[in-house]
Design a protein with these regions (language model features):
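Structural signature of FAD isoalloxazine-binding scaffolds in flavoprotein oxidoreductases
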Residues: 183-187
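Short beta-strand segments
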Residues: 33, 91-97, 159-165, 169-171
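Short, acidic/small-residue loops that bind anionic groups at enzyme active sites
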Residues: 116-122, 188, 192
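Short loop/edge segments at beta-strand edges and connector loops
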Residues: 134-136
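A short alpha->loop->secondary-structure connector
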Residues: 180
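A charged helix-plus-loop insertion that forms the helical arch/lid used to bind
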Residues: 105-115
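ATP-binding/phosphotransfer module of carbohydrate and carboxylate kinases, centering on a glycine-rich
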Residues: 2-7, 11-91, 100-103, 121-132, ...
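Adenylate-forming
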Residues: 141-147, 168-170, 189-190
Length: 338
C-alpha cells in the first residue's frame, strides 16, 4: 500500500523515570492511530522523539479486512526506505475507535466494520511477530498527552476531548484505566441532567455529550434562539450556527452566546468534579476542536469545577491538550513501553 503523506518531525526528548528503565538502545517503536478516514502512523525513538509520520487511507470495504494488511505493508515500506529492520522495532501500539478488551479483542468496531477480531494479534502476525499492544483511541490519546503533551510531567491525568462528541481517557499511575469491558473513560456518557428531549446516540438521556460537544453547543444555541428573544449576533446564522460561532460570539460579549457557554462550562465542571471525586487525577487535559476556544473556555469550566469540589483545596488542575491530531500516535507508541 503506497504511503500517502510523509513528514519529518522532531519531538520532545524528555522521558519519565519508569520509561527510561524500559528503553532499549537503538530500538524504535511504532504508533498506529486507526481512524475512520485515514490511519496515522509514527516512528518513534523510545525516548519519545518522533522521527517520521505518515498516513494511509482506511479501506473499510468488506468489513475492514484490508486495514491491518495496509498498515503492515506501509510499515514495511517506510522501514525499508529508511534501512530499518523489523528486528530493530521494539513493538507497535494500536489505537482503535471502539471498545477494546484487556486481551486486545474487539467484539465490534462500527467505525471500521470489524467484528470478533483481535487486531493486535493480527498485526503482530503480519509483522513477523513483533509485539503489538492495543487500546481504545481516546484512552491512547490520553496516554500520549501524558507522555509528551499537556499532561507531561504527571502520572495521573484525565483527558476530555470536545469534538463532534465528547470522549475521554483515564490514566492512573501511567496506566490506561479501560475497565473490564473496555468502557472506562466514556466520559461523554456521564449523565448530568434530565431533559426528555435530549436523547443521546447511546440510548441515554442527558449525557454531557449532548451539551458540551460541538454539535451539542450548536443545538443549545438553536434552542435558546427559538425560546428567547434576546438580541444576538448568532441569529444571522440561523440553523447553520456552529460551536465556533457560539464561542467566538461569547468571547465578544454576546449575551445569548455567553449564556450557552456558561451552561456548557457548568455541566463540564460538574462532570470533572464527579471524576475528581472518583479517581483524583493530578490534571484534566482538555482537547478536541472545541478546546480551540483556549483559556476563555478553560476559565469558565474551572469556575464551576471549583464550585462543585468545595471539600478539596488540593485538586487536579485543568489545562489544554498540546499534541492535537498526533496524540493518538504518541499514545500508541507509549503503549509499547508498558
Amino acid at each position: 500500500m503506497p504511503v500517502s503523506k510523509k513528514k519529518e518531525e522532531q519531538g520532545k526528548t524528555l522521558i519519565g523515570e519508569r520509561s527510561l528503565a524500559m528503553c532499549e538502545n537503538g530500538k524504535k517503536c511504532i504508533g498506529v492511530d486507526v481512524g475512520g478516514t485515514s490511519v496515522k502512523l509514527g516512528l518513534f525513538e523510545t525516548d519519545g522523539t518522533l522521527r517520521f509520520k505518515w498516513e494511509v487511507p482506511t479501506r473499510k470495504e468488506e468489513g475492514g479486512r484490508y486495514i491491518l494488511e495496509d498498515v503492515a505493508a506501509s510499515i514495511r515500506e517506510v522501514l525499508a526506505e529508511r534501512e530499518i529492520h523489523l528486528a530493530d522495532i521494539l513493538g507497535a501500539g494500536l489505537g482503535i475507535p471502539g471498545p477494546v478488551l484487556p486481551d486486545g479483542y474487539v467484539e465490534v468496531c462500527v467505525n471500521l466494520g470489524w467484528r470478533d477480531l483481535n487486531p493486535q494479534k493480527e498485526l503482530s502476525a503480519l509483522l513477523d511477530g513483533i509485539p503489538v499492544k492495543s487500546g481504545n483511541d481516546a484512552n491512547v490519546a490520553a496516554l500520549g498527552e501524558m507522555w509528551r503533551g499537556g499532561g507531561m510531567g504527571f502520572t495521573d491525568i484525565v483527558m476530555v476531548t470536545l469534538g463532534t462528541g465528547v470522549g475521554g481517557g483515564i490514566i492512573i499511575d501511567e496506566k490506561i484505566i479501560a475497565g473490564k469491558h473496555g468502557l472506562g473513560g466514556e466520559i461523554g456518557h456521564i449523565h448530568v441532567r434530565d431533559e426528555e428531549w435530549e436523547h443521546c446516540n447511546c440510548g441515554g438521556v442527558g449525557c454531557v455529550e449532548q451539551i458540551a460537544s460541538a454539535t451539542g453547543i450548536a443545538r443549545e444555541a438553536r434552542r435558546r434562539m427559538a425560546a428567547e428573544e434576546t438580541p444576538s449576533a448568532l441569529r444571522q446564522y440561523g440553523d447553520d450556527v456552529t460551536a465556533k460561532d457560539v464561542l467566538d460570539a461569547a468571547k465578544a460579549g454576546d449575551e445569548l452566546a455567553l449564556s450557552v457557554v456558561e451552561t456548557v462550562g457548568r455541566y463540564l465542571g460538574l462532570t470533572l468534579a464527579t471524576i475528581a471525586m472518583t479517581v483524583d487525577p493530578q490534571m484534566f487535559v482538555i482537547g478536541g476542536g472545541v478546546s480551540k476556544a483556549g483559556q476563555f473556555l478553560i476559565d469558565i469550566i474551572d469556575k464551576y469545577y471549583q464550585h462543585y469540589t468545595p471539600i478539596s483545596e488540593n485538586k487536579g488542575i485543568i489545562g489544554l491538550a498540546k499534541l492535537g491530531n498526533d496524540a493518538g500516535i504518541y499514545g500508541a507508541a507509549r503503549l509499547v513501553l508498558g
